[in-house]
Amino acid sequence: MEVAAKLRGAGMSAQKARLVADQIRGKSVEEALDLLTFSTKKGAALIKKVLESAVANAEHNEGADVDELKVSTIFVDEGLTMKRIRPRAKGRADRILKRTCHITVKVADQ
């Protein structure tokens, strides 16, 4: 049994979120939560919330035992990119790209 949770439109680039996602792929849920709790990366807090949601979904909807769950799949896709403008000297302007991402976490029995 595999249960998923998604966060769409997370306010960070997919490249930065993937750094954290790669660390917990394949680990047990308990080990992954410990790693995310003590990580200093911004993406760790977002991924931790999605992982906790997936665990809650598995426990509530499927009646799974939390101690036997592991992170079977985790991936980060690019979301919308919002374009903003920063005024510069002499009437020029630079384009600012505010990137977002979609985080998907799937947990399964070991």
From Swiss-Prot:
Q: Which SUPFAM superfamilies match?
A: Ribosomal protein L22 (SSF54843)
One function term, GO molecular function aspect: rRNA binding
Q: Which PROSITE patterns match?
A: RIBOSOMAL_L22
Show the InterPro entries listed in the entry. Ribosomal_uL22, Ribosomal_uL22_bac/chlpt-type, Ribosomal_uL22_bac/org-type, Ribosomal_uL22_CS, Ribosomal_uL22_sf
Q: Choose any GO biological process term that the UniProt entry carries and state it.
A: translation
Known Gene3D superfamilies for this protein? Ribosomal protein L22/L17
Task: Report the family membership.
Answer: Belongs to the universal ribosomal protein uL22 family.
> What is the recorded function of this protein according to its Swiss-Prot or TrEMBL entry?
This protein binds specifically to 23S rRNA; its binding is stimulated by other ribosomal proteins, e.g. L4, L17, and L20. It is important during the early stages of 50S assembly. It makes multiple contacts with different domains of the 23S rRNA in the assembled 50S subunit and ribosome.
Q: What is the name attached to this protein's record?
A: Large ribosomal subunit protein uL22
Instruction: Name the gene.
Output: rplV
